[in-house]
Amino acid sequence: MEREQKKKFYITTPIYYPSDKLHIGHTYCTVATDAMARYKRLQGCDVMFLTGTDEHGQKIEDKAREAGVTPQQFVDNIVTGPKGVLDLWKLMNISNDRFIRTTDDYHVAAIQKIFRKMYDNGDIYKGKYVGKYCKPCESFWTESQLVDGKCPDCGREVQDAEEEAYFFRLSKYADKIQDLLENTDFLQPRSRVNEMVNNFIKPGLEDLCVSRTSFSWGIPVDFDPGHVVYVWVDALFNYTTALGLYNDKYHDYDHYWPADYHFVGKEIVRFHSIIWPAMLMSMGMPLPKHVFGHGWLLLDGGKMSKSKGNVVDPYVLAEKFGVDALRFFLMRTFPFGSDGNFSNELLINTINVDLANDLGNLVSRTTAMVQKYFGGTLPAGCKTCAAPEAYDTELLSLASGLRDRYEADMEACAPHKALEEVFKVIQRANKYIDESMPWALAKDMDANGARLAHVLYNLLEATRICGILLAPFIPDSCTKLFAQIGADEGVQTWDSAKVWGSRPEDAPVVKGENLFPRIDMDKALEELEAIRQASAAPVQPAIETEPWQEDVDFDTFCKSDFRVVKVKACEAVKKSKKLLKFTLDDGSGTDRQILSGIAMYYKPEDLVGKTLVAIVNLPPRKMMGQESQGMLLSAVHKENDEERLNLVMLNDAIPAGAKLC
């Protein structure tokens, strides 16, 4: 079927903030979105599944400074480095069609156009922000919105904030947003609506700060370069720029927008259900059809948080128990719209009970009996039985109606309920084995061979239907399942899941390895605890520092003039592989030029706007035909025999020309 003839379905995760490695909570949302995307592809829809990373902001800038790298280097490591975001989604078998980074050039250019359009239509204006700011959440608050003087979202300390800023006229759209929330199914589950209306809209929506001047790591406002676009515009519009809005990178905005679903954690429902639709209204753009705010995975009763350090590493669990087992656990165990308490014991128990005992045993016992009693191929005529037993009819009826029940739950964004329906059939099939007693029938094949073949066909067919509907959740395991029960691609379809008897009678059955081996609970918990303790005390790399220099007297030291400098421009020096040329503001009113041999450590564009330290009273010297008027300070060491260099970077609030003493 051509793309234009298929029903389109556009679904997104939030774009994650790469201030640290992602944890099991991020994995939960992404697996849920992936399962929904796979389900819609199974139905034959034209699916676009987007995820990505939100890479700008003060927190990233500060963490990069602490690490002695540029913000771009910092986020590159988290996103594309070993066991980074991209590696994690590959490991978890995430089938996203696109991945957006807000540092992508096409997104940057598009955001500048979007910001200007809202400014030109009067919905963005310049003013002064005075209030409170939560750096971990990157959220602004008024005094009245604080809870016990702390951030109402995360409960952490806030800081005073005062700076020139641009504001979005959020208050202008308050009535329209309230109507959207109260009178449509835009925001789900419904319990989120009262929270948004009562806590944010009815107390009075205030205009929203949408630019910052107190840090530089962001998209510059092109008509006022002292400002960078704040997260609300930069991050939220990713859902449209990734389709080609205001850029030539992609060309399917008109095809896929509006989104069918934004899946987001409940802590960012406010941004997606109030701020996001208001900005789209300002732009004259269609609104997404639904925002679904899922619950949190709790650890010891509290929310997991990178900044709190109480997170669970999905890499450890996936590598220990298997990717499909982890995917299944996340979707089977926790109602998607509610919070759930995570524990390793619960994970292992779910794997053992549902996957090893119920599903694994059904596949293993059925395929083993087909091999043992019929050499792997059932005889002709096994689909039908002249005198079916009541339990035959019960299994057939339950399995034949499974697809409709499953579909209703998936459409309601209740994957845990959809899986519950599948496992009702699996459990009924296991009971069917006990009721039909194939081993007893096999004692007299002449009298009971046809009946035995019919029983085993029923088991294979029930397993096939369950496998089709489990595939969005455990795709690799279902591929193995289909191979074992003799179900080729033609009977793995959505349509065939509703048609009992689709599997050919003579399709070969192969007894394969157990899909989900049982896990020794005590042993696994001991191993996980050992891993946790080892990761809590990371091995420090072998570091070598330069040898100490001979002592100098205080007067000699004081002759060196250390000054704070701001990078106005930076470029590579032609015909040099090592040198970068800096144009610096040293507070004197005249630009200072310094050449530094750090090209192998930094990209010049990443250093513009940074606050550095220079010795400014060294005699000028010629380098590659150009004059260098001083030296930038950096730290040099060897780590695992590799030389590392980090420029000394200071807080951007320190003015150019300030003397270090």
Across the structure, where does each feature detected by a protein language model lie?
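N-terminal catalytic cores of NTP/NDP-binding nucleotidyl/phosphoryl-transfer enzymes
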Residues: 2-74, 78, 100-115, 120, ...
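Structured secondary-structure scaffolds
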Residues: 2-51, 106-110, 154, 160-372, ...
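A glycine-rich helix N-cap at a beta->alpha junction
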Residues: 80-97
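Cys/His-rich short segments
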Residues: 121-174
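Helix-rich, typically C-terminal accessory recognition domains appended to large enzymatic cores
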Residues: 126, 333, 338, 346-383, ...
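Hydrophobic, well-ordered secondary-structure elements that form the walls
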Residues: 272, 301, 422, 459, ...
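Intrinsic disorder at enzyme termini
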Residues: 481-558
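Phosphate-backbone binding interfaces of nucleic-acid-interacting proteins
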Residues: 537-661
